[in-house]
UniProtKB/Swiss-Prot annotation:
It comes from Xanthomonas oryzae pv. oryzae (strain KACC10331 / KXO85). This is Ribose-5-phosphate isomerase A. Catalyzes the reversible conversion of ribose-5-phosphate to ribulose 5-phosphate. It is an enzyme of class 5 (isomerase). Homodimer.
Length: 215
């Protein structure tokens, strides 16, 4: 699938215009996008990064990393996904960067999601749903998620997010109404961010292949 990821990432370069500040996500597919962006880095003003990992890779390519507080809204955000449904709703957060990813997506006029074909699903939920949680609320949130959804929350106990929080991965879900579930989980005290991108889905999904498909 690495070739499909690369092809999707390189297709996303078509959406980058001269003088842009580009929002950049996190993950293995985005790494290919950053590498491709490095070839045209002289054409853009810089990037806003969703993780320390992506920041380091951008700087390796000589791309200036800017603070979202100073840039205002962005024209373009490019990121991957763990799952994508036919409505371009996503599960994200396998790399534990979901909160910053959601912030940048919200601040961007256009969200381009780059995936390999294995990420396309008819219904979200086979991939465990990440939920970023304040550490002291971990058990409380897990109990409430279990009661609300029937899914099984599992603490990703070797991981802290870049924000210093923990991640619960919710297994055994079949998410037929992603917008409603995103809204409900966000109401639980202690939840920082839910890895459902449904209220603000992708505007365009690029599926890697020969040739890439644009949805």
């Amino acid at each position: 699938m690495s070739e499909a990821k690369r092809l999707a990432a390189e297709k996303a370069i078509d959406y980058v215009e001269d003088g842009m500040i580009v929002g950049v996500g996190t993950g293995s597919t985005v790494a290919y996008f950053i590498d491709a962006l490095g070839h045209i880095g002289h054409r853009i003003k810089g990037a806003v990064s969703s993780s320390e990992q992506s920041t380091a890779r951008l700087r390796q390519h000589g791309i200036e990393v800017l603070d979202l507080n100073h840039t205002g809204n962005l024209s373009l955000y490019v990121d991957g996904a763990d799952e994508c449904d036919p409505n371009r709703c996503l599960i994200k957060g396998g790399g534990a960067a979901l909160t910053r990813e959601k912030i940048i997506a919200e601040a961007s006029e256009r969200f381009i999601c780059i995936v390999d074909p294995s990420k396309q699903v008819p219904v979200l939920g086979k991939f465990p749903l990440p939920v970023e949680v304040i550490p002291m609320a971990r058990s409380l949130v897990a109990r409430q998620i279990l009661a609300l959804t029937g899914g099984q929350p599992v603490w990703r106990d070797v991981v802290l997010t870049d924000n210093g929080n923990v991640v619960l991965d919710v297994h055994n879900l079949q998410i037929t109404d992603p917008v409603a579930l995103e809204r409900s989980l966000n109401q639980i005290p202690g939840v920082v961010c839910v890895g459902l991108f449904a209220r603000r889905p992708a505007d365009v999904v690029i599926v890697g292949g020969e040739p890439p498909r644009v949805l």
